[in-house]
Amino acid sequence: RICYLAPRDTQICAPGQEICYLKSWDDGTGSIRGNRLEFGCAATCPTVKRGIHIKCCSTDKCNPHPKLA
């Protein structure tokens, strides 16, 4: 699997990691910086705490930055 790890950077995921994810959350700075984002690979869709949104998908490069998609 190939997933984004940053807005424009991709990486081949480790064996067994077939899920790409994009987490987003408000870090309290409001509109100054917008939501914080975390990109990555995983074996299963990560469990997140309340207030954190996550998108999981299972095709190559399916977790792009929302503004670059």
UniProtKB/Swiss-Prot annotation:
The keyword Cell cycle does not apply. Disulfide bonds join C3-C20, C13-C41, C45-C56, C57-C62. Expressed by the venom gland. Gene3D superfamilies: CD59. InterPro entries: Snake_3FTx, Snake_toxin-like_sf, Snake_toxin_con_site, Toxin_cobra-type. Keywords: Acetylcholine receptor inhibiting toxin, Disulfide bond, Ion channel impairing toxin, Neurotoxin, Postsynaptic neurotoxin, Secreted, Toxin. GO terms for molecular function: acetylcholine receptor inhibitor activity; ion channel regulator activity; toxin activity. CDD domains: TFP_snake_toxin. One of its GO terms (cellular component) is extracellular region. Pfam families: Toxin_cobra-type. The keyword Disulfide bond applies. Its main location: secreted. PROSITE patterns: SNAKE_TOXIN (PS00272). It is found in: Secreted. Binds with high affinity to muscular nicotinic acetylcholine receptors (nAChRs), whereas it binds with a low affinity to neuronal alpha-7/CHRNA7 nAChRs. Belongs to the three-finger toxin family. Long-chain subfamily. Type II alpha-neurotoxin sub-subfamily. Has the length of long neurotoxins, but only 4 disulfide bonds, as short neurotoxins. This is Toxin Lc b.
